[in-house]
Amino acid sequence: MPRLVIFLFLSAFAQAADWPMWRHDPGRTAATTQKMPAEPHLLWSRELPPLRPAFKEQRLQFDRGYEPVVAGKRLLVGSSREDCVIAFDTNTGAELWRALADGPVRFAPVIVGETAIFGSDNGCVRCVKLTDGSTVWQKRAVPSNRMLLGNQRLISVWPVRGGPVAKDGRVYFAAGVWPL
């Protein structure tokens, strides 16, 4: 079973320099100038259920692991098993809220100000408040409500399957099924 582990340095790091999207920034550099402590300590860990990848073929499983993002005292992960984004307190590991998505969430949300934005296999992009997970807005990001059978359930013909990126006041994402 996947285990989400947060070290003490992540809590201190999050206060100084957040990790607001997958691989840190719009360039997907996965790098920061933040210094690591000499001796990190385990702060908390959580058992999370295994995700449900979009494809059974292992080499196609782009979504087989949790991808956390951090802002302030919130750590967020998307879940393709539970069709939601889950927020945890970075100090205690306590679950703070769940924002339901009406479809699998396969990629990390992007944190923009006091909100988190994410897409799901239902073809929608949703914005929720970081404080409580309540919906600020939801937009159908695709041209129609057409559905197909995917992972033993109905999903959009154009699921939102690209981790969103925020840059210069805009959010970018991708929709569609691949490989064809």
Please name every model-derived segment.
Residues 3, 38-41, 110, 165:
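Generic low-complexity segments that are intrinsically disordered, proline-rich and/or Lys/Arg-biased
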Residues 3-13:
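Sec-dependent N-terminal signal peptides
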Residues 11-16, 115:
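Residue-level detector of intrinsically disordered, flexible termini
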Residues 17-66, 73-76, 84-86, 94-101, ...:
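Aromatic (tryptophan-biased) beta-strands that constitute blades/sheets of beta-rich domains
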Residues 19-23, 59-85, 102-126, 153-180:
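Repeat-blade elements of multi-bladed beta-propeller folds
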